[in-house]
A protein has these predicted regions:
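Short amphipathic alpha-helix that is part of the acyltransferase structural core
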Residues: 1-43
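Acyl-donor binding region in acyl/amide transferases
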Residues: 15-24, 44-45, 51-52, 58-167
Length: 168
């Protein structure tokens, strides 16, 4: 099966378009969603979500937080360049499709490994995400993501020479 053709057939009205983090619409919707953000650092894949050829939202992947043992254990690697964090997922103009979120995640899961390899030369093992309350992560559950547990709620401060060696 040619999966690219498969998704074009079933989701022809839905697509992800890769953009730079400086794309004006991406920036606008990202800052509206995370007004206190200091920006995106590290490796990243940023997409505008299109439905019927109109932009309806954004989704992005970026380098994960450093030293999360649970992620490294799950992916069985100490190389944190082999998995990404779903750092933003925002639908601004929701179409009349109750499964739109899950469809977007499915396209992201199938296209991001290719995009990541083309951009960085590494094979992407997977994607992680954090879901903050009151959200429940229902779209991730519907897309069959594995639940790894709740975060400890630790804020990482970049202080001292060894901040990057701490494990959480």
């Amino acid at each position: 099966i040619d999966y690219n053709s498969y998704y074009d057939i079933f989701y022809s009205e839905l697509s992800l378009v890769s953009v730079k983090k400086s794309h004006p619409l991406y920036v606008k919707w990202y800052i509206e969603h995370y007004p206190k953000s200091k920006g995106i650092v590290g490796r990243q894949l940023n997409y505008l979500i299109y439905y019927d050829n109109l932009p309806i939202g954004i989704i992005g992947l970026s380098s994960p937080p450093l030293n999360y043992k649970i992620f490294r254990n799950y992916f069985q690697t100490d190389n944190e360049k082999l998995f990404l964090n779903n750092n933003v997922f925002r639908i601004v103009r929701k179409p009349n499709d109750s499964n739109i979120g899950t469809k977007i995640l499915k396209i992201l899961r199938t296209t991001s490994p290719r995009d990541y390899h083309e951009r960085y030369g590494d094979n992407l093992l997977g994607i992680v995400t954090f879901v903050e309350k009151p959200r429940t992560g229902s779209i991730y559950k519907a897309d069959n993501w594995d639940y790894l547990g709740e975060t400890q709620g630790i804020e990482v401060k970049r202080r001292g020479d060894d901040w990057f060696q701490k494990q959480y």
